[in-house]
Amino acid sequence: MKVVAFERQQQGTGASRRLRNAGKTTGIVYGGEVAPQMIELDHNALWHALKKEAFHSSILDLEVAGKSQRVLLRDVQYHPFRQLVLHVDFQRIDPKKKLHTKAPLHFLNAETSPAVKLSSAVVSHVVTEIEIECLPADLPEFLEVDLSKIEAGQSLHAKDIALPNGVALTAHVDAENPVIASATIPAGAVSDEAAAGEGETPAA
């Protein structure tokens, strides 16, 4: 995914405000052996790009002054109540160094699971992304979580994710192995089932 930015000459609160009034968003590119670079981007183009999941989880080709560099989006600052992006941070990547980043989780097949089909359970997504480490060439756009075998009362954990080759959970996620999805029967459904059982008359 390509992103076009421009070198930013002016800094400070006043300069940032003038850029916002002109439809621009400030940013910075850092990392690697090169000094941090102040940039500005078209706000509307950036706003629409930020709506795409891949913009947050993929390696981006950032073009500044005609030169392209490979980066990851690391931080976005939004206005507290206006639809406005105040600032973005990009990190340069080294193809030979492992990345520590977050990958989105795509949950699949919940509707065909025993939890839903047999028990009318509700499958909840406890987290929507997970921290991973890998080389840039192995970075997945997202990770799939297969829920087809989950049963009522069960939970899936981070280590249950089928990771692609070259991708691993970060050390602390691997150690904690947090819950990523769970299947529970709604309280009302449990009460209804119990009441139905109590109302049954034993056969003579």
From Swiss-Prot:
Gene Ontology annotations of biological process type: translation
Molecular functions (GO terms): 5S rRNA binding; structural constituent of ribosome
The UniProt record lists the keyword tRNA processing: no
Record's GO cellular component terms: cytosolic large ribosomal subunit
Function text: This is one of the proteins that binds to the 5S RNA in the ribosome where it forms part of the central protuberance.
HAMAP family according to UniProt: Ribosomal_bL25_CTC
Cited NCBIfam families: bL25_bact_ctc, PRK05618.1-5, PRK05943.1
Subunit note: Part of the 50S ribosomal subunit; part of the 5S rRNA/L5/L18/L25 subcomplex. Contacts the 5S rRNA. Binds to the 5S rRNA independently of L5 and L18.
Keywords: Ribonucleoprotein, Ribosomal protein, RNA-binding, rRNA-binding
Keyword RNA-binding belongs to the record: yes
Name of the protein in question: Large ribosomal subunit protein bL25
Family note: Belongs to the bacterial ribosomal protein bL25 family. CTC subfamily.
A matching Pfam family: Ribosomal_TL5_C
